[in-house]
């Protein structure tokens, strides 16, 4: 995406990418609900998903003409006088200035932390939902589907919001929403205030399920808000020649979080119980909020000649 998209439009472009990814995730969750029965085989699910991935690869290879898209990006940058380099004390070199380097490190730390929070929930939720809330068979996918639908609805709007108020402020709003959602979900599974829910008799007959669905919708909105803007913030600090390198930094941080958190959260839940899952996620989101406050670069810049650029025809 950053290779073929001018910098001012990368949040909106990333919103489209995340929208399509969320639609894919929603399809997967629907397949789980349909194909996975109680103590059933996962083979049909894996077969269908593998087939869809191969179909996606064929479409990508056949239809995405990257050199032509890159040429059109360069034409747009020249036409609208968009510079690909940020101005800092080391302009003209590949190294970041000190201020940008500090921002980059804190931003990557934030990426690591919020992936540790979110992936802990998604990787352990099926077990949590069955043991703590009593959800049976593939119905555990329904709360996650609520989050995905909420994210799908919000991907494009949050990309537009970032162009108005900035990526950092938009991300901070998303982190705050996820802290609220994870904290609320923790209380629904902890029985601290006598509100622990039991869905063993069916999810739709329990009024508390609908409250839980609201919290998961808030979580989905928060995650969309973060995801749409975090990657563009990283590559905003790159130059045309270093986009691949900075993309690697971003995915190293995100993958490290996703790899580490199942192990770490599993150790904690083994010691204190499954009820700790959402508390764990909320704590890491709070840490991500703190590190994000120290990020001062990578925000979106005003779009020159906005009305013309946003309608730039690439056909």
Model-predicted regions and their roles:
Residues 123-140:
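Short amphipathic helix-loop junctions that connect adjacent transmembrane helices
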Residues 36, 153-167, 193, 269:
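Helix-to-loop junctions at the C-terminal end of transmembrane segments
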Residues 11-36, 251-261:
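Glycine-rich segments within core transmembrane alpha-helices of 12-TM secondary carriers
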Residues 164-176:
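Cytoplasmic membrane-interface "Motif A"-like loop-to-helix N-cap segments
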Residues 176-205:
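C-terminal ends and interior cores of transmembrane alpha-helices
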Residues 1-5, 225-238:
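Intracellular juxtamembrane helix-capping segments at the cytosolic ends
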Residues 68-109, 308-315:
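Juxtamembrane intracellular "pre-TM" segments in multi-pass secondary transporters
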Residues 34-51, 267-285:
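A membrane-interface helix-boundary motif in multi-pass transporters
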